[in-house]
Amino acid sequence: MALHNLQPAPGSTHKTKRVGRGQGSGMGKTATRGQKGQKSRTGYSQKRGFEGGQQPLQRRLPKIGFTSNVVKPHAINVDKVKKVAQLEEITMETIRSVYKLPKYVTRVKLIGSSVQEIVSKIKDDNISYSGQK
């Protein structure tokens, strides 16, 4: 076996039928297009998705999808997580040390009724709090 004598298995390939090459071929004259009409003319092609006047699938289905790229802050209730309120300086690192945050969380919002008491301790721009103006 060598590259120069490789050939497909017998019967696996067929010669393509050449249409419009004389009446003796059985596919001459109209070349399998039938008589007259738009589909028999040269240059004819339907646009993609055309279903013969029926409402196309892409118009029948509802429009979906929009995902905001704005990263929403992870909310931490200070009343429930007392350790956050006891920190001397509140930064992302100190919050991570006392509260288990997922790695993807980059912004935090402190909520709860006792937030106003610890506002002066916040030293990070990525930390906001409820009632902020």
From Swiss-Prot:
GO cellular component: cytosolic large ribosomal subunit
GO BP annotations, alphabetical order: translation
Region (Disordered): 1-62
Biased composition (Polar residues): 32-45
InterPro entries for this protein: Ribosomal_uL15 (IPR030878), Ribosomal_uL15/eL18_sf (IPR036227), Ribosomal_uL15_bac-type (IPR005749)
Ranges in a coiled coil: none
GO molecular function: rRNA binding; structural constituent of ribosome
Record's keyword terms, sorted: Ribonucleoprotein, Ribosomal protein, RNA-binding, rRNA-binding
NCBIfam families in the cross-refs: rplO_bact (TIGR01071)
HAMAP family linked: Ribosomal_uL15 (MF_01341)
Subunit note: Part of the 50S ribosomal subunit.
Family in the record: Belongs to the universal ribosomal protein uL15 family.
Name of the protein in question: Large ribosomal subunit protein uL15
Organism: Nitratiruptor sp. (strain SB155-2)
